[in-house]
Amino acid sequence: MANQLKVGIIGAGAMGLLYAANFANISELTLFTRRKEQSDLLNQKGLSLKDNSELKNIHIQATVITDAEKLSEQELLIIAVKQYSLKTILPLLRSIPERVPLLFIQNGAAHLDSMPLLGNKRTILLGISEHGAGREDDTTVIWRGHGRTKYSIYQGELNEAVIKILDSNPDFPVEKHASYLDIINEKLFINAVINPLTAVLQVQNGKLLENKEWHELLKTIVKEIQTVLPVENALEKVEVICQVTATNFSSMALDRMNNRMTEIDGIVLPILEKGESLPTLHALYHLIKGLEGESDV
């Protein structure tokens, strides 16, 4: 362990647990949790990863997010909290030594506005995750869909050790791209179509193609978003994701089904702010905000 890179993951929801499971064997990993109860359970029981019929139990080290000493020891920090939780941990991120690179893997684009607040001297990577994951409990994550992590350098530069660790697990591919805006906008576009629709309808992604009326609605939303966020072959890309994740519920659908706050403000609001000619997307946005209000989340 002494020669391995120290990698920390902030956030122990579905994505944080999935990334922890996949980085545990290639790094000296620490998972930072909001609740001490969860970090204690992870230290006692380990992390269980369910992948189809396979179940792995992985020994990991966990501690609370307020463990400043442990945070400052890391050589790479992956920020895996939900979009709406990011602002609450910004003061903590600002206190981390500037030599520690930060990799953000949030949904949406609202977090881009927060990057300048972290200063211009640290290395910041902006990424997206194509994986599907669901947290069963505090120590168990279900790998619902395999994909890639794509990232680009927002500012700064990477040392060889970090590049090597990101590229060292063929079962969990990480790709470097030239433009962070390109990868974020493409993921944002896809999420802005699939997530709110499935959240309102409370259906799996594949139903958006199977049901003729819902498919027409999907195509309408794609056309609207294209007017303010052009993405090449957008409809095809959205439909492919619906096909390959046909049996999955989107993260926003799962949030609604569990009466949790959604990431609607991070995913849809940045698009709505680009223009007014988006009536269907506006309607979906207000439907979900209204549902959140009814659930008092």
Curated annotation (Swiss-Prot):
Q: What is its main location?
A: cytoplasm
Compartments where located: Cytoplasm
State its Enzyme Commission number(s).
1.1.1.169
Q: Which InterPro entries match?
A: 6-PGluconate_DH-like_C_sf, 6PGD_dom2, ApbA, Ketopantoate_reductase, KPA_reductase, KPR_N, NAD(P)-bd_dom_sf
Which EC class heads this enzyme's classification? oxidoreductase
* Pfam families per UniProt: ApbA, ApbA_C
**Biological processes, Gene Ontology terms:** pantothenate biosynthetic process
The UniProt annotation places substrate binding at N107, N191, N195, N205, S251
- Pathway annotation: Cofactor biosynthesis; (R)-pantothenate biosynthesis; (R)-pantoate from 3-methyl-2-oxobutanoate: step 2/2
Q: Catalysed reaction per UniProt? A: (R)-pantoate + NADP(+) = 2-dehydropantoate + NADPH + H(+)
**GO molecular function, a single term:** NADP binding
Keywords from the named record: Cytoplasm, NADP, Oxidoreductase, Pantothenate biosynthesis
Q: Which GO terms describe its cellular component?
A: cytoplasm
Catalytic residues, chain numbering: K187
Q: Where does NADP(+) bind?
A: G11, A12, G13, A14, M15, G16, N107, A133, E263
The family classification in the record reads: Belongs to the ketopantoate reductase family.
Q: What does this protein do?
A: Catalyzes the NADPH-dependent reduction of ketopantoate into pantoic acid.
Q: What is this protein called?
A: 2-dehydropantoate 2-reductase
